Structure formats: structure tokens, C-alpha cells
Amino acid sequence: MSLEKISNPQKYISHHLNHLQIDLCNFKFVEPGKIVSHFWVLNIDSIIFSLVLGCFFLSIFYTVAKKITTGVPNGLQASIELIFDFIRSNVKSMYQGKNPLIAPLSLTVFVWVFLMNLMDLIPIDFFPFISERFFHFPAMRIVPSADINITLSMSLGVFILILFYSVKMKGLIGFCKELTLQPFNHPVFFIFNFLLELVSLLSKPISLGLRLFGNMYSGEMIFILIAGLLPWWSQFFLNVPWAIFHILIISLQAFIFMVLTIVYLSMASQSH
């Protein structure tokens, strides 16, 4: 649906909640609002923006690392050093053990999630207008962390690391004992313990992904509602205060995702 053809707030809101999707069965764009009966559909917009932001993050940090100086740093180098020191202090205080992977992983998670969240502050009609006018795309959403597929994919990666370090540190037998001998250390409760621990284990990636998705989706929805329901001359008085408050949410959600990643991996890396 073209932006020019949207005639009421309901259509406007519905249009901005549609992803740019491609059907892998015929490699054609899915019409906005159409329900596809099979699984093989990709949200192209979320994938593209998340990859672009990831490459942007890597290029900035790589450029600063190549030009780093021991003298008085410039503004960008000073900012990155502050972020690095912040991440390192959190890892030291929360991760019980020594693992050279945890700090870089935490830095990547924090900055990448923050950049994805930050896209929520861009005016919601900007990229859809450009994509429709110049590329004839039927829909476009630009906040990857407001797509449950992206957030659950990231949490799935964390979950795989949890399983890897649990087996590595405790051994396969030790990991199985952890699932069956807690909280009641008796053979009678093996099945009961396993069910409890399985729910606890699976709830970590699910809650990690859903928490980020829920907060960012609701924030994006408020921006869409303001733009769709209010006249243009009054939107400023709600958009600006909400955007200022949303900066806190953006930063906080990136921090929470990073902290829980560190905590979960710390728990998995304990040998007992």
C-alpha cells in the first residue's frame, strides 16, 4: 500500500507495522498484510538493517583501533575508551572466571543492540518514503530489535554459548547431573528435577529475547500511534518528550541484554 493511498489512521498504523518480506518459495515480495501459509518467509528489512548496523559498528571500532594514540585522544577515541572501560568493569564484577571471549562478546552485544534500538528515534516515515519512492518496496520497518525474529536469534546465540560452556566446564555427565540432581538430590526426583531445570534453562533465552522485543516494539508503536492519530502540528509536543524518555529505554535495554548475557555465561562457566 502506497503512503499516498493511506486514507485513515487505521491503515496508516497497519502499514507501518508490516515488514518488507520475501517469500523464499518464489523469491517475490510479500504483499503487506497478506498472511503467508508457510514458514519460508524472511523479514528482509530487519536483516539488512541489523547487518548494516553491525558493519557500521565494526568499521568505527576498527578505524579507531588503527588510529589509536597514547596521547590526548580525540572525541571518538575517548568515547570508545569510555565504553570499553564500562564494559570491562561490568565483566570483571559479574563474570566469575577468566575467559578472553566474554569482554569482546559483551562489547559487541551492548553496542550492536544499542545501535539497533537507536533506529527507533528516526522519523517513522523517512525510510518507508525513500524505499517506496526510489526502490518501490511495498513496506519497510527500520528497528531490527522490534522484530521478534532478530531478538530471539540473538538470544539463541547466547543459549548455544550457555550449553557449550556448561558442557565444557562440567563435562557432559556433570551437566546431566546438574539437570537431574537439583534442587532435590535423590533418584526419586530425577524426572521432577529435570522438568524444573529444563524450564529454567529454556526460559533464559526466551525471556532474554522477548524482553528486548517487547520494550522496543511498544516504543515503536507509541511513535506510530502519535504520527497516525494526531494532526501534524500537535505531534511535536508528544514526540519530543517521548523521544527523550525513549533514549533511556534504548540504553537500558542494551545494558540489560548485555548484563544478562554476562550473568548467564558466568553461571554456565562455573565448574560446580
UniProtKB/Swiss-Prot annotation:
Membrane topology: Multi-pass membrane protein
Keywords for the protein's UniProt record, in alphabetical order: ATP synthesis, Cell membrane, CF(0), Hydrogen ion transport, Ion transport, Membrane, Transmembrane, Transmembrane helix, Transport
Signal peptide range in chain numbering: none
Gene3D superfamilies tied to this protein: ATP synthase, F0 complex, subunit A
UniProt subcellular location: Cell membrane
Alphabetized GO MF terms: proton-transporting ATP synthase activity, rotational mechanism
One GO CC annotation: proton-transporting ATP synthase complex
Subunit (UniProt): F-type ATPases have 2 components, CF(1) - the catalytic core - and CF(0) - the membrane proton channel. CF(1) has five subunits: alpha(3), beta(3), gamma(1), delta(1), epsilon(1). CF(0) has three main subunits: a(1), b(2) and c(9-12). The alpha and beta chains form an alternating ring which encloses part of the gamma chain. CF(1) is attached to CF(0) by a central stalk formed by the gamma and epsilon chains, while a peripheral stalk is formed by the delta and b chains.
Family in the record: Belongs to the ATPase A chain family.
Name used for this protein in its record: ATP synthase subunit a
Encoding gene, per UniProt annotation: atpB
